[in-house]
Regions:
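TRNA-recognition modules of translation machinery and tRNA-sensing kinases, especially anticodon-binding
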Residues: 2-277
Length: 277
């Protein structure tokens, strides 16, 4: 949807600067590009690694109760079935019958009108699953289907017991990792913000059930203060409290930042209850 805080001219300048100075390039550019995928250049990868190192120091190296993990991108597909991703990780999509453009319904100002050409001749909205599918092994059939992970938290839940035993941790403690995630976005846009391959920095904190909200409030405050220490001003940062929760959440907030395209989520803090355990 349109955002009154958006500045398209500034966004255009930012994209041009990033490419010209070697921060971010369109992937596969000499072959026409590949929508939703970006490569980090010499300065971009330095900046990216610096951000990751700062986050890792804050979340892992300075805490005795947070352990690290580096899990695989592809795992047993049963994990994604159990987590609800195969059945519920989707967005509503509609197609314009006039210009053939495809749109995510919740990003349209008017869900009855095509934002590309203005036509009202649209298909009925339908669920579009965001999981990227592949095959493992020499046979391409349903029994060998696998998925690129859509988020980095699920392997943390799967390896929870192994990490706890190996690190000799007791509740409460957390597991953090930095790694790639993949989502088959209907309409990639806003530069690297809404892309199909991206890096996530994630920490899952485990505690007794009755202490869930206490720790949710603790981490909410910790993460807000982290961005304040980095220099984010109150004018350019706000907290969005979710009223409509994801299938796994008991409470959730987003830390939003004012980007050139408007307000967008930089980080989420979610109370997942016992959904994944």
């Amino acid at each position: 949807m349109a955002d009154e805080a958006s500045n398209p001219e500034l966004m255009e300048k930012l994209v041009s600067l990033c490419k010209r100075r070697g921060f971010v390039f369109p992937s596969s550019e000499i072959y026409g590009g590949f929508n939703g995928f970006w490569d980090y250049g010499p300065y971009g990868c330095r900046m990216k690694r610096a951000v990751e190192a700062l986050w890792w120091k804050e979340m892992v190296e300075t805490r005795d109760n947070i352990e690290g993990l580096d899990s695989t991108i592809i795992a047993n597909p049963t994990i994604w079935k159990a987590s609800g991703h195969i059945d519920q990780f989707s967005d509503l999509m509609t197609d314009c019958k006039t210009c053939k453009a495809r749109h995510r319904v919740d990003q349209m100002d008017d869900p009855t009108t095509c934002p590309a050409c203005g036509s009202k001749d649209l298909t009925e909205p339908k669920e579009f699953n965001l999981m990227m599918k592949t095959f493992v092994g020499p046979v391409f059939d349903d029994e060998h289907v696998a998925y690129l992970r859509a988020e980095s938290c699920q392997p943390i839940f799967v390896d929870f017991h192994s990490v706890r035993v190996a690190a000799r941790q007791k509740l409460p403690f957390g597991v953090a990792q930095i790694g790639k995630a993949f989502r088959n976005e209907i309409n990639p846009r806003n530069f690297t913000f809404r892309s199909r391959e991206f890096t996530q920095m994630e920490m899952e904190f485990f505690c007794d059930g009755e202490d869930g909200m206490k720790w949710f409030e603790y981490w909410k405050e910790q993460r807000i203060n982290y961005y304040k220490k980095l220099g984010f001003s109150e004018d350019n940062m706000r907290i969005y409290v979710h009223e409509k929760l994801a299938h796994y959440a008991k409470a959730a907030i987003d830390i939003e930042v004012k980007f050139p395209f408007g307000w967008g989520e930089l980080e989420g803090v979610h109370h997942r209850g016992t959904w994944d355990i």
